[in-house]
């Protein structure tokens, strides 16, 4: 039977990869395995994590728990700050590998600082989300699943990012191992006209709910308030201090 691909560049590439490479990859959402079988996962510090972000009537509120685990089985740290300022009107909250998260934050912050130095202004949040997703897609951050939030002339923004490079905007979101429990609270309690104080309460309830059921989340909460002027991050060893 005649094969239209015979002798074509497509066929030569198939032969070159010896059948081990899908010629249609990479597809949207697919990740390279990097030759890593996962054998070292038990030695990797992970934040396990519940992180949430939600817009308010004048900004954005984020919240995250404070627990890190080793291989998902042992609590390795009880005082981890999983949210960092990227620029004075934007912050990033992280779930996944601690090392990958720290490297990603440094890279994104450096790009934001370079943009400000060249342009004399902060990067708008949509552009910052695009930059973040491009870094995730092209860089060695395969175990990092962040939430980016910020406030610009168009109001508050919350973006869910993932290692495939996707960037999804919503009024509220959650990531991490405690996401199902946190999202249940956000679905029930979120409204479009929440004040900042009300949003803090909702975010704290979401973290508290996840900490009750998810063994990789707990040990306190960091609450982050973002406006057009500044990012304020406050830690509490007990979620009840916020509720």
Label the model's feature ranges.
Residues 1-47, 86-87, 91-163, 227, ...:
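Contiguous domain-boundary segments centered on the initiation and propagation of an alpha-helix
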Residues 2-4, 128, 160, 164-243:
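A two-mode feature
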Residues 39-43, 50-52, 72, 80-83, ...:
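A generic local secondary-structure boundary/capping motif
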Residues 46-48, 78, 99-103, 123-131, ...:
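Conserved active-site and cofactor/substrate-binding residues in soluble primary-metabolism enzymes
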Residues 50-54, 60-62, 145-150, 220-225, ...:
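Short beta-strand scaffold segments in enzyme catalytic cores
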Residues 61-65, 74, 159-162, 235:
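Beta-strand scaffold of nucleotide-dependent catalytic cores
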Residues 64-87:
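Active-site cofactor/substrate anionic-group-binding motifs, chiefly glycine-
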Residues 71-79, 103-105, 169-172, 243:
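A short, polar/proline- and glycine-enriched secondary-structure boundary/capping micro-motif
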């Amino acid at each position: 039977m005649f094969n239209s691909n015979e002798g074509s560049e497509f066929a030569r590439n198939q032969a070159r990869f010896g059948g081990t490479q899908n010629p249609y990859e990479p597809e949207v959402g697919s990740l390279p395995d990097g030759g890593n079988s996962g054998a070292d996962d038990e030695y990797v510090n992970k934040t396990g994590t519940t992180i949430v972000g939600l817009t308010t009537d004048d900004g954005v509120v984020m919240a995250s728990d404070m627990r890190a685990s080793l291989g998902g089985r042992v609590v390795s740290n009880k005082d981890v700050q999983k949210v960092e300022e990227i620029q004075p009107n934007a912050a990033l909250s992280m779930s996944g590998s601690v090392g990958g998260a720290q490297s990603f934050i440094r890279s994104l912050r450096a790009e934001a600082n370079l943009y400000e130095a060249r342009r004399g202004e902060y990067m708008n949040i949509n552009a910052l989300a695009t930059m973040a997703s491009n870094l995730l897609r092209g860089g060695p951050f395969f175990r990092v699943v962040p939430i980016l939030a910020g406030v610009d002339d168009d109001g508050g923004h919350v973006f869910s990012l993932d290692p495939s490079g996707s960037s999804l905007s919503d009024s509220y979101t959650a990531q991490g191992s405690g996401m199902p429990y946190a999202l249940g609270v956000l679905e029930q309690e979120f409204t479009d006209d929440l004040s900042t104080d009300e949003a803090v309460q909702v975010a704290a309830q979401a973290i508290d709910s996840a900490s009750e059921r998810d063994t990789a989340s707990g040990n306190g909460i960091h609450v982050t308030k973002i406006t057009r002027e500044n990012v304020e991050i406050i830690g509490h060893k007990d979620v009840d201090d916020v509720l």
